[in-house]
Amino acid sequence: NNATEKKKIIYVGSLAGFLPGGPGHSHQSVRDISALGGIPGLTLIEPSCEAEVAQVVDYAVNQNEFSTYIRLVSIPYSVPFELPDNYELKEGQGVALREGTDAVLFAYGPVMLSEAYLAAEILEKDYKFSLKVVNLPWLNLVDGHWLSDQIGEIRRVFTIDNHLLNGGQGQYIAATLSEIG
């Protein structure tokens, strides 16, 4: 229906990515972003925390005229960060969860963002290395102007994918960087 009849569909994937413990490795999809990311008109999003889920669902139901794949972590997972009070989900954009000046790291979802956030704290404390951690919930959309603003003068850019290396968000970020120079 999504491709042939041009009908809006909201897909929800659970147990996607590398999940700690829980249901085991045979139930974890690590190829969904690459498999679904190239489907025309299909937007892929993974919320960073419970607070972002409502905005993602509202986007899928009320704002996106095309189909959406919402990638959820369906096991309890506590996060060491909070979204800013004024945070609004905007297509292709995210939000800095932690400021930094030595490097910037883009990630998504509660598992990878939590690990990135905790790693940034260790780097700051033990090595005086300042890592900016950015939540980018859009898995196959990156706003080039926003990306450029987030990077600014920082020369080290990293991504963490909760996915196979090929076809994940990191490739979309790299492609956008090559487009904007």
Each language-model region and where it sits:
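Thiamine diphosphate
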Residues: 1-15, 20-21, 30, 66-68, 72-181
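Structural signature of the thiamine diphosphate
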Residues: 13, 33-85
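Short hydrophobic alpha-helical runs that function as membrane-insertion/retention elements
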Residues: 10-11, 44-46, 132, 159
